[in-house]
Amino acid sequence: MSEPTTNARDGSVAMPLAIPADVLAELEAEGVGVLATLDAVEERLLERAHSSHAFTREVSRYLLDAGGKRFRPLLVCLAGHLPQAPRDSVPFDALADAGVIVELVHLATLYHDDVIDDAPARRGITSAHLRWTNTLAILTGDFLMARASELSAELGVDVTRIISQTLARLCEGQIAEVQGSQTLLPQAVPVIEPSVAHYLDVVSGKTASLIETSCRYGALLSGGTATEVEAAARYGFHVGMAFQFSDDILDIASDPQESGKIPGTDLKEGVLTLPVLYALEDDPDGELAALLASSLDDDNVAQAVSLLRGHTALDRARATAEQTVNAAIDELAVFPEGAATRALSRLARYAITRLG
């Protein structure tokens, strides 16, 4: 899937887009101003991440300046062109501001996640917590969330309520993940045994909720009916789930030269992904379970990956991803067909096509 870059006009930062060039051309031809919207988002992100305190400004812009696909603002823009409403009634400024809100929250979670996971790098640079300490990384994430909340208040009570609920879901998903982690936890933490149900609970909160909100914002701010808003939100939820499923599959099945990711990275970090959980569900006392219970050195991880590649669990995970993509695309049926629906359909299908 080719990824064009935006035109760096008006001082905006060129970045890769998560849509093919031909789809982008159709969107622009039909007046769905993806480039203009994302240019506005980029400019307003810099404004909202600004602080009069020089050091706060430096840290808050650290990951922002490192780039990113702005996937969530893109979804806000596309979902904003779904409802059956006159083209000139689509609120450019409101959609751009909503894109800023979801991207600020996403950036904030990256600062926090890197502390939780003790990640060494993010977007090709040293993680903020290693460069400046855990405390400063956490506070910077909080600062960006505060800026997102401030902007949401300018768009109204509904927008503020939705992002507040989303933040709660993000936290619930992260807490559930910690409870189910394979690391040693204090006795005061109630441990949750790994299961597919627990995994889905984590992903729905930690990953899918903000993507769902991005699509909900777009349809809501463009005057969509209750039916349209909920359909857009469900589309976003399913897409968020599907992309996580495909990431899990790629961790096992991908060619490292193509994906840039060493197979079994999640396994080595103690993360039980969908294919792993399906395999353990089928054979809880088998060879894979024994490997996972041992010290996960490079040899054991390689052996586990080899077992998974030959296991029906991988095909089952692929089927789950495909079913979830189809569920997302089905939600688009309530909207009139156009460039936005076709783009969102292609985007959802990419969760499957990237698997090869």
Q: Over which residues does each language-model region extend?
A:
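All-alpha prenyltransferase/terpene-synthase fold signal
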Residues: 1-356
